[in-house]
């Protein structure tokens, strides 16, 4: 398996790039999120790669970050999501945006990606729901900056509320609230919403 490639960037033609590694040129398919971050032609580039083997073709996919590659691997494990669809998803949404869509169960966001219909979006959300840590993702996005917010978030998720409901509840909390008061305020808010 080829896990990473470092070499000279020779060509860029979306979604394909050509990287020269000591005289051998590797054609690598990349999502647009990676393509936009590539250096100029002739510069050194490092890509985290995934080697895709099928009976009729061997393909190399490249990603600027390990998180993109890990998410690509998760996506392609889902029934009906192939490598091209995985690339399309990563081209349409950043890793953080996709994680937020999964946490908030936002299928509309996914259906805006070419090739992703309503059923595929719902299947993606269902399959990825348990594989993504909402606390880590919301922290990345700045939505749960304090430990108090994280504790409230964890408690509400443990009670069975989904990410979208929890986000709305966290947004209405007053500044400097304690964990217990925050949970109580959130539960009151959520009971009115339902």
UniProtKB/Swiss-Prot annotation:
Gene Ontology CC: cytoplasm; Holliday junction helicase complex; Holliday junction resolvase complex
Keyword Cell cycle: no
Record keywords, A-Z: Cytoplasm, DNA damage, DNA recombination, DNA repair, DNA-binding
Gene3D superfamilies for this protein: 5' to 3' exonuclease, C-terminal subdomain, Nucleic acid-binding proteins
KW DNA-binding (keyword) present: yes
InterPro entries tied to this protein: DNA_helicase_Holl-junc_RuvA_I (IPR013849), Hlx-hairpin-Hlx_DNA-bd_motif (IPR003583), NA-bd_OB-fold (IPR012340), RuvA (IPR000085), RuvA_2-like (IPR010994), RuvA_C (IPR011114), RuvA_C_sf (IPR036267)
Gene Ontology terms: biological process: DNA recombination; DNA repair
Disulfide-linked positions: none
Domain III, as annotated region: 144-194
GO molecular function per UniProt: ATP binding; four-way junction DNA binding; four-way junction helicase activity
Location in the cell: Cytoplasm
Region called Domain II, residue ranges: 65-140
Region (Domain I): 1-64
Highest taxon listed in the record's lineage: Bacteria
Region (Flexible linker): 140-143
Family: Belongs to the RuvA family.
The protein's assembly and partners: Homotetramer. Forms an RuvA(8)-RuvB(12)-Holliday junction (HJ) complex. HJ DNA is sandwiched between 2 RuvA tetramers; dsDNA enters through RuvA and exits via RuvB. An RuvB hexamer assembles on each DNA strand where it exits the tetramer. Each RuvB hexamer is contacted by two RuvA subunits (via domain III) on 2 adjacent RuvB subunits; this complex drives branch migration. In the full resolvosome a probable DNA-RuvA(4)-RuvB(12)-RuvC(2) complex forms which resolves the HJ.
Listed HAMAP family: DNA_HJ_migration_RuvA
Protein purpose: The RuvA-RuvB-RuvC complex processes Holliday junction (HJ) DNA during genetic recombination and DNA repair, while the RuvA-RuvB complex plays an important role in the rescue of blocked DNA replication forks via replication fork reversal (RFR). RuvA specifically binds to HJ cruciform DNA, conferring on it an open structure. The RuvB hexamer acts as an ATP-dependent pump, pulling dsDNA into and through the RuvAB complex. HJ branch migration allows RuvC to scan DNA until it finds its consensus sequence, where it cleaves and resolves the cruciform DNA.
Domain remarks in the Swiss-Prot or TrEMBL record: Has three domains with a flexible linker between the domains II and III and assumes an 'L' shape. Domain III is highly mobile and contacts RuvB.
Protein name, entry field: Holliday junction branch migration complex subunit RuvA
Gene behind this protein: ruvA
